[in-house]
Amino acid sequence: MTDQPRSEPLARRDIDVLVLGEINPDVIVRAADPTPSFAQIERFVDSIDLVIGSSSAIFACGAARLGLRTAFVGVVGDDPMGRFMLDALRARGVDVAGCRVDRDVPTGASVILTSGSDRAILTAPGTMPLLRDEDVPQALVARARHVHVGSVFQLDALRPRLAARLGAAHRAGLTTSADCNWDPRETWAGGLWEILRETDVFLPNAAEATRITGTTDVEAAARLLVDAGPRVVAVKCGKDGAIAVARDGTLTRVPSLAVDAVDTTGAGDSFDAGFLAGFLAGRPVLDCLALGVAAGSLSTRGIGGTASQPTLPDAEAAARAAGLLP
């Protein structure tokens, strides 16, 4: 890791969230039953859309939509899909000047088969795992208040240096967060426990939390994870809302928000953005959970992860209407 330049005082830093993560588009195939039939059988579906994909990019768009000044560091290929992603992120207010274009590897992509309530995902990784520690511009770190890492298990080149990267961020006065997302190898290791020691907010879903810890109980999993070092572990539980366990052992629960869901792609990433919007504003864990649930739920009203992401006033209003906020 190269030496960091002197960081600006917190009050003068002009990036609220610096996102380190993967970047790729999604091709969303939507139907009541999107299961394909082989033997050259053609089936008609409701829609096929090319949209902003990748958990980290969806998170970044959600954070920007909520009013956080957001910058992104990732890798794309020198191809139409990479240009599509960079242009789409810029259009949503995300600073992508720190992204690297790889001339040799194509941009990754995911095909998502969704019925609205559930989905299957096929992914060609491409440039997704190629982000390296040396790709992170130190000038951006010096301007940031917070570093968020998306899809820890997919960032193969960065992951071995990630604990050190987050530790350096802490020493420079930043706070940190991470979402692991699903481990495609299903080993649930890869240095995660060391990374958690340098993570202030950890944001897995229920399936990920229980797989990582080898437990079947979500609350027990959250307690094991928070013991590894985070200030708070917030676990997304789908229709059951979300829970959080703080370092002092306090458990907080928030129920789900009823919406007419069209597509659940990226709902967890929008939850992360809502939770961190509260965290960075110094709000209590209950408020952070409520904002996360509201942001995640409202994001499901449109196709793709970003089309229906709410503003902060929209998320707060929805949370209040549901009794999640006073």
Predicted feature residues:
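Glycine-rich phosphate/adenosyl-contacting loop at the front of the ribokinase-like
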Residues: M1-V75, P80-D87, A91, D260-V262, ...
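Conserved N-terminal subdomain of the carbohydrate kinase-like
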Residues: T35, Q40-R43, L50, R65-V149, ...
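Structural detector of well-ordered beta-strand residues that form the stable sheet scaffold
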Residues: L18, A71, T176-S177, A234
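Active-site metal-binding loops of divalent metal-dependent hydrolases
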Residues: I23, V152, S270
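Conserved phosphate/ATP/ADP-binding segment of small-molecule kinases
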Residues: L166-T175, N181-R253
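Conserved phosphate-binding/catalytic region of the ribokinase-like
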Residues: T2-L18, V29, A168, V218-P326
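A short, aliphatic-rich alpha-helical micro-motif
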Residues: R12, L140-A144, L196
